[in-house]
């Protein structure tokens, strides 16, 4: 986890220990259940760093919904790093849901709720932040989450090279930044308050 300091991500030893525990756990489960394309521990660490990098520029939310969490990127990783943030992980695939629930218990994450459903079936009050990585295009993500967001909700979408085309498809004005790092474009849609 020496990569974290190089990226400007400062976490205490307890959180780093949980991130390392998550990496080992995911590597073990992935060998049997095929949860992610990250096959090695090094690849898992790279995904952890990718998940955490936005901590260098976002406002820390009190509540966070991660859409399509998959094997835990970025939602479970953010939950580990932000123990004061209530995190809801929305994931419809049963084998991933089983892993996420097990990992949350094993790592002692009291701030995590796993919803075994698609985001359009999630029922909550508005979240402070909604995140997603590799799920669908920006316009559809905003539409799917409109019932569980309000004018104060911010969005953190982990995007690839199509982010600029996707932004052009979104109607209306919004305040956003696109932070580029390697092949990743972090789309941070901010509220105006």
Swiss-Prot record:
Protein name from the UniProt record: Ribosomal RNA small subunit methyltransferase G
Catalytic function, reaction form: guanosine(527) in 16S rRNA + S-adenosyl-L-methionine = N(7)-methylguanosine(527) in 16S rRNA + S-adenosyl-L-homocysteine
Organism listed in the record: Sulfurovum sp. (strain NBC37-1)
Gene: rsmG
Keyword set, alphabetical order: Cytoplasm, Methyltransferase, rRNA processing, S-adenosyl-L-methionine, Transferase
Gene3D superfamilies noted in UniProt: Vaccinia Virus protein VP39
Record carries keyword Cytoplasm: yes
Annotated GO CC locations: cytosol
Predominant subcellular localization, coarse grouping: cytoplasm
Its biological purpose: Specifically methylates the N7 position of guanine in position 527 of 16S rRNA.
